[in-house]
Regions:
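Positively charged, low-complexity, intrinsically disordered RNA-binding extensions
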Residues: 139-240
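N-terminal cationic and glycine-rich segments that engage phosphates or anionic surfaces
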Residues: 1-116, 121-125, 130-139, 210, ...
Length: 240
């Protein structure tokens, strides 16, 4: 009995991991499909598609899945139509949220997002009432951090490639640029032989909001619940 019980728990745990992995793969494939539909199937000419493919590869999405997702985006007829949605909201403590979705059912996404936010004591906001608190950037995260004698030379090269800001911490360097310059900046990083830990489009808060410990835990729980929704691809907040 003990052996059976232990195996049952192992299977439950593995099943939960497999389900989470499958949901992640679905989200990644949807992002690829939408990116390909928007600006074509060539990553060299479509920075957003390139970013989506890079994220998928890092998450070990199989190559066949990536190719099918691209074809789904450019194929058009007969395919389930996906659309992008962006929700703006306020969480407890006045924390601002931006929730990005890729979905085949607008009503489902709206209901799911609204339900979680209102249950947490927050509220959906009108378009533009939250995004003004953020800046939209392309971000290349380089690891390890850029340092040493050639740091100034490297940073100058990044500025020439479109970098608007370069931030360093103990583990790496974040290079920020206008979204339209992300592909060029990513190429510059690669040409210099540096390791790009991730290449992303991000909403970055202009000013962060301090919360009490209790409110902070509430907001963090809400963020995790939103990210777990099948249709949600990204969640951003201005919580410090």
């Amino acid at each position: 009995m003990a052996r059976h019980s232990k195996w049952h728990k192992v299977r439950q745990f593995k099943g939960a991991i497999d389900a989470k992995r499958s949901a992640s793969f679905t989200k990644l494939a949807r992002e690829i499909t939408v990116a390909a539909k928007e600006k074509g199937s060539d990553p060299a000419m479509n920075a957003r598609l390139r970013v989506a493919i890079e994220r998928a590869r890092k998450a070990s999405l199989p190559k066949d899945n990536i190719e099918r997702a691209i074809q789904k985006g450019v194929g058009g007829a007969g395919e389930v139509q996906l659309e992008e949605l962006r929700y703006e909201a306020y969480a407890p403590g006045g924390t601002a949220l931006i929730i990005e979705c890729v979905t085949d059912n607008r009503n489902r996404s709206t209901n799911d997002v609204k339900h979680l936010i209102t249950d947490a004591g927050g509220s959906l906001a009108s378009a533009g009432s939250v995004t003004y608190l953020f800046d939209r950037f392309g971000v290349v995260r380089v690891q390890p951090a850029i340092d040493g004698e050639k740091r100034d030379e490297i940073e100058l090269s990044f500025i020439e490639a479109g970098a608007q800001d370069i931030l360093h911490d103990d583990e790496g360097s974040d290079i920020r640029c206008a979204p339209s310059e992300l592909a060029v900046l990513a190429d510059a990083v690669q040409q210099m032989g540096l390791h790009a830990e991730h290449i992303e489009f991000e909403w970055i808060p202009k000013i962060t909001v301090e919360t009490t410990e209790d409110v902070g835990m509430q907001v963090q729980e809400l963020l995790e619940e939103l990210e777990a929704l099948d249709d949600v691809s990204r969640v951003y907040s201005n919580m410090a």
